[in-house]
Amino acid sequence: MLMSAVILLSGSLLDPNPGLIFWTAITFVLVLLILKKIAWGPILGALEEREKGIQSSIDRAYGAKEEAEAILRQNKETLAKAEAESDRIIREGREFADKIRAEITEKAHTESQKMIGAAKDEIEQEKRRALDVLRNEVADLAVRGAEKIIRASLDGEVQRKVVDSMIADLSTKQN
């Protein structure tokens, strides 16, 4: 306030007054020194701390971005590996199914061939048995016929009757 009164008493504000300039400069320097001692250090410290905090945040953000990109690359690689693995498993499954199908088909074919062979063998055995039975019957008939021929006289008419009788016996046994 004292300064304001001095300025007003001295005249115009635009007129240079050396005393006023001197005291203004001294006051400015004193305020500057006081601020430097008291406030300048904490203000600069706070600004530096703020700058360090901002730089740290930027560095962390870049680090997080790089880490996220690395994780993304790793996830893509893992996904590609998983897809390749699933393709391999599917391919192996199909190959295994084809192999099993071929084995089952081969086994069924082998079994059917065995069954056909067994059936043929059984048919052949039945055929042999039937032929054996037929031979035995023919032999019996021949023996009976020979027996009848020997018992009967050997004239032609008797022989014809014996043969007709044997044929009749044979036809009755077949039916």
From Swiss-Prot:
In the UniProt record, which is one GO cellular component term?
plasma membrane
Q: Where in the cell is it found?
A: Cell inner membrane
Major localisation: membrane
Among SUPFAM superfamilies, the record links this protein to:
F1F0 ATP synthase subunit B, membrane domain
Alphabetized UniProt keyword annotations: ATP synthesis, Cell inner membrane, Cell membrane, CF(0), Hydrogen ion transport, Ion transport, Membrane, Transmembrane, Transmembrane helix, Transport
Q: Which residues cross the membrane?
A: 20-40
Q: How does it sit in the membrane?
A: Single-pass membrane protein
Question: InterPro entries, from UniProt?
Answer: ATP_synth_B-like_membr_sf, ATP_synth_b/b'su_bac/chlpt, ATP_synth_F0_bsu_bac, ATP_synthase_B_chain
List the molecular function annotations (GO) for this entry: proton-transporting ATP synthase activity, rotational mechanism; proton-transporting ATPase activity, rotational mechanism
- What's this protein's family per the entry? Belongs to the ATPase B chain family.
Q: What does this protein do?
A: F(1)F(0) ATP synthase produces ATP from ADP in the presence of a proton or sodium gradient. F-type ATPases consist of two structural domains, F(1) containing the extramembraneous catalytic core and F(0) containing the membrane proton channel, linked together by a central stalk and a peripheral stalk. During catalysis, ATP synthesis in the catalytic domain of F(1) is coupled via a rotary mechanism of the central stalk subunits to proton translocation. Component of the F(0) channel, it forms part of the peripheral stalk, linking F(1) to F(0).
Assembly and partners are described as: F-type ATPases have 2 components, F(1) - the catalytic core - and F(0) - the membrane proton channel. F(1) has five subunits: alpha(3), beta(3), gamma(1), delta(1), epsilon(1). F(0) has four main subunits: a(1), b(2) and c(10-14). The alpha and beta chains form an alternating ring which encloses part of the gamma chain. F(1) is attached to F(0) by a central stalk formed by the gamma and epsilon chains, while a peripheral stalk is formed by the delta and b chains.
Q: What is this protein called?
A: ATP synthase subunit b
The species this protein belongs to is Chlorobium phaeovibrioides (strain DSM 265 / 1930)
